[in-house]
């Protein structure tokens, strides 16, 4: 964790470079929030074993090939009264063979718009579906951990709760090893849909997130840093870099 101006993105890039230098054969995933951030990190690292993607693209890339499980999961969610976001027209329940009895074969797709009748899911539905599938199908967790030995999340404070559950609750259930790192600042959350902080997962025990605080501010003058410290409520007290007056 680190406040504004502490060099979080620089640290993320340097960590990725060091991991790839020390482990030249492993693949690394970096999840960020915008396509602009994807492009920036790709350009700054430029390594064939690094996969940088948005949250939604990362999730879809890891579940899209499991069409049978996708259809079963969608139907289960359609029929779950607690899941209000997933409904097809006015149907109160959806039969288990809903997608199999269509005149034209249906392949579940992910696009910018939502058309569940034709098997097309959108942003929010993808998050719900992914959380359900990783919770139900443990094999998915092993597949992701076989693919990536390191997963880094940029701007974690804007990451959806469903994604944090996948990474910190479901993936650790299997024995395969994978190191997961979060870079961000709970005080800089932009979107209401983000988890904000991951305090519930912090600690020194096995499987818990160990916090590394970045207290040096490399961007702002001392007066701004002093004011920001008064406003922070998370215990991070920033210090001016040596070359800042």
Across the structure, where does each feature detected by a protein language model lie?
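Accessory N-terminal region flanking or inserted into the helicase ATPase core
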Residues: 1, 11, 27, 71-155, ...
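P-loop NTPase Walker
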Residues: 1-69
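Alpha-helical scaffold elements adjacent to nucleotide-binding pockets in ATP/GTP-utilizing enzyme cores
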Residues: 15, 40-44, 54-62, 147, ...
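Active-site catalytic microenvironments for nucleophilic, acid-base chemistry
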Residues: 18-22, 44, 65, 133, ...
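Alpha-helix N-cap/helix-start capping motif
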Residues: 35, 56-57, 138, 218, ...
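Hydrophobic "anchor" residues on beta-strands that sit immediately upstream
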Residues: 50, 150-151, 180-181
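Conserved RecA-like helicase ATPase core segment
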Residues: 168-244
């Amino acid at each position: 964790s680190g406040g504004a101006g502490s060099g979080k993105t620089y640290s993320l890039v340097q960590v990725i470079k060091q991991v790839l230098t020390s482990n030249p054969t492993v693949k690394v995933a970096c999840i960020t929030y915008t396509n602009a951030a994807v492009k920036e990190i790709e350009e700054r690292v430029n390594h064939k074993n690094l996969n940088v993607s948005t949250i939604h693209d990362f999730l879809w890339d890891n579940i899209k090939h499991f069409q049978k499980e996708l259809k079963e999961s969608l139907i289960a969610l359609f029929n779950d009264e607690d899941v209000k976001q997933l409904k097809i027209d006015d149907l109160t329940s959806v039969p288990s063979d809903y997608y199999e009895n269509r005149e034209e074969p249906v392949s579940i797709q992910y696009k910018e718009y939502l058309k569940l009748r034709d098997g097309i899911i959108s942003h929010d539905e993808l998050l719900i579906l992914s959380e359900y599938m990783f919770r139900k199908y443990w094999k998915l967790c092993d597949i992701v951990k076989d693919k990536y030995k390191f997963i880094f999340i940029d701007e974690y404070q804007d990451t959806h709760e469903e994604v944090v559950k996948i990474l910190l609750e479901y993936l650790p259930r299997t024995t395969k090893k994978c190191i997961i790192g979060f870079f961000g600042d709970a005080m800089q959350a932009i979107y209401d849909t983000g988890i904000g902080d991951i305090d519930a997962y912090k600690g020194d025990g096995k499987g818990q997130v160990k916090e590394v605080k970045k207290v040096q501010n490399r961007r702002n003058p001392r007066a701004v840093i002093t004011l920001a410290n008064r406003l922070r409520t998370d215990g991070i007290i920033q210090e001016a870099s040596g070359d800042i007056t």
